[in-house]
Amino acid sequence: MLLSDRDLRAEISAGRLGIDPFDDSMVQPSSVDVRLDSLFRVFNNTRYTHIDPAQRQDELTTLVEPAEGEPFVLHPGEFVLGSTLEVCSLPDDLAGRLEGKSSLGRLGLLTHSTAGFIDPGFNGHITLELSNVANLPITLWPGMKIGQLCLLRLSSAAEHPYGSSAVGSKYQGQRGPTPSKAYLNFAQS
């Protein structure tokens, strides 16, 4: 069941759902708007010949931050990682879906490529997979509304929520845009 604005406020007031910093004006009828942080991970296209998910490639991305008051410019066809300004903490009976903002989608900005699901128990900044499918550059301003977080109530609390040792949570507690840890999904020899 998708939570309404009333339910979202009740979960936040009860301290079960954490959104920090929280601004009540960001609550929509069935979601909470989230904003863009100031850190981005840019791919180093000349460092590797290809991306291999089975290999740890620490220098695949570089963390960049625009100067104070300046935007990050996302060029056509470019893909970077960003993150929400807000730290989100979900209880073990709520899951989240990050959706893009319609107004930004109409400009050609994709907020996530594939990973819009947030497991119950997750705590941290939500990493954004930002793509520009327009044919002009798009300026991304730190602090701008970038997406909306929808919350869904599970039929029962998760037995092993994200962050528990049983599920191998790679991104619990992440701060800022976090690079892929896909290599951990492969058997290590």
Swiss-Prot record:
SUPFAM superfamilies to which the protein is assigned, alphabetical: dUTPase-like (SSF51283)
InterPro entries assigned to the protein according to its UniProt record, in alphabetical order: dCTP_deaminase, dUTPase-like_sf, dUTPase_trimeric
Catalyzed reaction equations: dCTP + 2 H2O = dUMP + NH4(+) + diphosphate
Active-site residues, Swiss-Prot/TrEMBL: E129
EC number: 3.5.4.30
Site description Important for bifunctional activity, residues in chain: G116, F117
GO molecular function: dCTP deaminase (dUMP-forming) activity; dCTP deaminase activity; nucleotide binding
Keyword Hydrolase tagged: yes
Subunit structure: Homotrimer.
Protein family membership: Belongs to the dCTP deaminase family.
Entries under HAMAP family matching the protein: dCTP_deaminase
Name used for this protein in its record: dCTP deaminase, dUMP-forming
Source organism: Rhodococcus jostii (strain RHA1)
